[in-house]
């Protein structure tokens, strides 16, 4: 297939994003308008506020993406957009905008699964990466360990049965008074603490899955904090978050390594916002090196929600002839591998 230039749009949560991507791996622009400062005062994302801010920002974000890329609508071969999972109101803003563009410009519309987008972020930073490989997807809303069999073809080996890892980070951060967003704040404070100070539980299911559970360790942290407060004992917040982080990171690492062994894979790619966590990166690199497993991370800008990853995933769908109808609707509970 000749060079394909895709304009991608992402609005699944609290970032309004647009990007221009060539052949799935070359990013000409990647513009993100974040609402994090707005939602911080609420202690988390407020869906209605997020939707309104997307409406206000989306036109300017798309125009900037085209300008930075040095292209016009005439140069675009397809319009890609996230249609799930995510906040339904937020998804609809991006989806309706993309539909309008695709219809008015007579361009193909490609709906992209947000989680698949996170996985595809690795194709941008690692130009020679090709399936098969193992991918650990860790974000505020999702935690999966996946065997990527081919472009757009996934086998879910393990997933969370309750809280996502990033969600647990946010809840623990709130409990110790760090506020939102929890992940980066815990990562920073944990560097000052002793990760062996408190033994928090790690969930290990005695079945044939490599599923995750983070509600137990989250509850253990909350119980520890309550007990310390009842005793009027001083709480070392750095030790608490370092010990919590260690429990989460070790489970994520263990299951990713086990998946490599099960599927005889020699590469692990990391995806999602928690992929920026320094302890997770260090632990995976260390354990991977011991076993001859190459560990790959996207750059921090590609770990967060962005449209470049959506443009990358869309390209590989376009190669297979998978384009969407104008009747495409938002699917807030869309699962990995579903259409």
Curated annotation (Swiss-Prot):
Binding site for Fe cation: 114, 118, 305
One of the protein's GO biological processes: tRNA threonylcarbamoyladenosine modification
Catalytic activity: L-threonylcarbamoyladenylate + adenosine(37) in tRNA = N(6)-L-threonylcarbamoyladenosine(37) in tRNA + AMP + H(+)
Cofactor note: Binds 1 Fe(2+) ion per subunit.
This protein's encoding gene: tsaD
The protein's name in its UniProt record: tRNA N6-adenosine threonylcarbamoyltransferase
Family listed: Belongs to the KAE1 / TsaD family.
One cellular-component annotation, GO: cytoplasm
Enzyme class: transferase
Localization in the cell: Cytoplasm
Pfam families: TsaD
Cofactor: Fe(2+)
Ubl conjugation is among the record's keywords: no
EC numbers, comma separated: 2.3.1.234
Span of the signal peptide: none
């Amino acid at each position: 297939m000749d060079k394909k230039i895709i304009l991608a749009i992402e609005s699944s949560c609290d970032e309004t994003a647009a990007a221009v991507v060539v052949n799935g791996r070359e990013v000409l622009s990647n513009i993100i308008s974040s609402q994090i400062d707005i939602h911080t005062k609420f202690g988390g994302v407020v869906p209605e506020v997020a939707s309104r801010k997307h409406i206000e920002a989306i036109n300017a974000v798309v125009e900037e993406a085209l300008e930075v890329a040095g292209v016009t609508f005439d140069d675009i071969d397809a319009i890609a957009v996230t249609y799930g999972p995510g906040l339904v109101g937020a998804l609809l803003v991006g989806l309706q905008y993309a539909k309008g563009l695709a219809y008015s410009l007579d361009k193909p519309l490609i709906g992209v699964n947000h989680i698949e987008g996170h996985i595809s972020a690795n194709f941008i930073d690692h130009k020679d990466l090709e399936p098969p490989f193992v991918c650990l997807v860790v974000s505020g809303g999702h935690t999966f360990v996946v065997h990527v069999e081919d472009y757009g073809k996934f086998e879910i080996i393990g997933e969370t049965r309750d809280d996502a890892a990033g969600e647990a980070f946010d809840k623990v951060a709130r409990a110790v008074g760090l506020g939102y967003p929890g992940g980066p704040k815990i990562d920073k404070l944990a560097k000052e603490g002793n990760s062996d100070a408190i033994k928090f539980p790690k969930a290990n299911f005695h079945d044939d899955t490599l599923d995750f559970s983070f509600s137990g360790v989250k509850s253990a942290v909350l119980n520890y904090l309550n007990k310390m407060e009842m005793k009027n004992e001083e709480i070392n917040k750095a030790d608490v978050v370092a010990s919590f982080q260690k429990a989460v990171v070790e489970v994520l690492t263990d299951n990713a390594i086990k998946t490599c062994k099960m599927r005889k894979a020699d590469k692990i790619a990391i995806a999602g916002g928690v992929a920026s966590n320094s302890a997770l990166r260090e632990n995976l690199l260390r354990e991977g090196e011991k076993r001859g497993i190459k560990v790959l991370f996207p750059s921090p800008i590609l770990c967060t929600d962005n449209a470049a990853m959506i443009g990358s995933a869309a390209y590989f769908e376009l190669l297979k002839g998978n384009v969407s109808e104008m009747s495409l609707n938002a699917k807030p509970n869309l699962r990995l591998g579903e259409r």
